[in-house]
Amino acid sequence: MDVRQSIHSAHAKTLDTQGLRNEFLVEKVFVADEYTMVYSHIDRIIVGGIMPVTKTVSVGGEVGKQLGVSYFLERRELGVINIGGAGTITVDGQCYEIGHREALYVGKGAKEVVFASIDTATPAKFYYNCAPAHTTYPTKKVTPDEVSPVTLGDNLTSNRRTINKYFVPDVLETCQLSMGLTELAPGNLWNTMPCHTHERRMEVYFYFNMDDDACVFHMMGQPQETRHIVMHNEQAVISPSWSIHSGVGTKAYTFIWGMVGENQVFDDMDHVAVKDLR
């Protein structure tokens, strides 16, 4: 488990390129036949990937000491979106087949969660966010047909994109975790511009569906103290409440966003005008 401490905005603005990457970038999300796990002190979110290839993968009691519990989801809820080939997630004996861009919400208290790929030639890639939970909501599969899609932006401003809301109150109940998938239209490069912050929530972006020769310049920092982190395919970045989170790519891309914090009101944002950015 990679533990990331929270950081004050006054400290963050003094960091150089490597310092920013050390604090906020999750460089390696998927490792064959393993799970990765980054624990952030910011709202206690856990972020990672699970890629079963030749065997099943589960998060066992080895994380209990670090989380102060007997098993992983004793006091947590889990959201998983599969960006790879078809796979299965077995929750306390109940097997769910999770295809490409399908998702599974797992409620607090699930003791055994096992991940597997159906075809080792095209393994599943389960990207997950995990957050503290105060009650148990039912485990539920979510398909692309069930999400709440919203198309925003314009080709003229190069930010035409479709936001697919997987884990939001309109789709299912969670304690605090919200997740979704945003896909840029061909030829569009900007996400979340004009940008915003949200004082009451933190957020993690996971960029994928990128060519090897492409990258995203992820913008972060306070609106008057902006910085950037160069992102490559299948990497994630942590965004504190005080930071903007926006990006521009050298080619179109897709990203998964996950939020935890005070509320689940999607539009609870503090908008920042482009003219006010520095």
Curated annotation (Swiss-Prot):
Catalyzes the isomerization of 5-dehydro-4-deoxy-D-glucuronate to 3-deoxy-D-glycero-2,5-hexodiulosonate. Its EC number is 5.3.1.17. Belongs to the KduI family. CDD domains: cupin_KduI_C, cupin_KduI_N. Disulfide bonds: none annotated. Pathway: Glycan metabolism; pectin degradation; 2-dehydro-3-deoxy-D-gluconate from pectin: step 4/5. Homohexamer. Zn(2+) binds at H196, H198, E203, H245. GO terms for biological process: D-galacturonate catabolic process; D-glucuronate catabolic process; pectin catabolic process. Coiled coil: none annotated. InterPro entries: KduI, KduI/IolB_isomerase, KduI_N, RmlC-like_jellyroll, RmlC_Cupin_sf. It comes from Escherichia coli (strain SMS-3-5 / SECEC). This is 4-deoxy-L-threo-5-hexosulose-uronate ketol-isomerase. Binds 1 zinc ion per subunit. Its cofactor is Zn(2+). Keywords: Isomerase, Metal-binding, Zinc. PANTHER family: 4-DEOXY-L-THREO-5-HEXOSULOSE-URONATE KETOL-ISOMERASE. GO terms for molecular function: 4-deoxy-L-threo-5-hexosulose-uronate ketol-isomerase activity; zinc ion binding. It catalyses: 5-dehydro-4-deoxy-D-glucuronate = 3-deoxy-D-glycero-2,5-hexodiulosonate.
